[in-house]
Amino acid sequence: MQPAYYEDLEQIKNKIWSMLDNAIKDRGSPFRIPVFICGNQDDFDGRIVVLRKSDQSNNLIQYHSDIRSDKIAKLKFNKNAALLFYDKEEKIQVRLKVECIVNHNNDITKQSWLKTGHMSRKCYLVDNGPGTESDTPTSGLKSELDNFEFTMEQSEAGYKNFTVIQCKIISIEWLYLAAKGHRRAKFDLENNKEHWLVP
């Protein structure tokens, strides 16, 4: 038996947002770690990010990053990007086209930083930015920080590297895999249009 949203566009949209919202709370949700793809025709790549916020009222999702990451330079050159989600159990793939805003040292980052846990802040304490070449295997952290004993006060030094990437959703493509017959739909949020697609 197929789910209620199998042939109902409104229920599909509700299901997508429900999965995004749930991913914020559920660390085990496959939608919590989408692939984020950015760049241009000559230089683009993808990486896993951790979903930190889902805001249907503003068609927005967001994640955190290091200002020194190479994706920040890519986004400053081209704010258009894509995210890919897949849930094997639900048999649902979701593709988002988004426009990105890089927030650094502003009210948005301050609010998010206050909610960022002690251990999560460790990522932003590395001396050199992510992707910097090294002659030896390294975490990038000073020896006194390369453990679980650093203090919350010490973690504050990472704030200068902390960014919040807000992704304004332009369109959503949904694919449901079913033996009876796959279903695919597109939601154009910019123009408030939706239609079925051949899978």
Regions found by a protein language model. Give the residues of each.
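Binding-site signature for planar aromatic cofactors or substrates
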Residues: 1-199
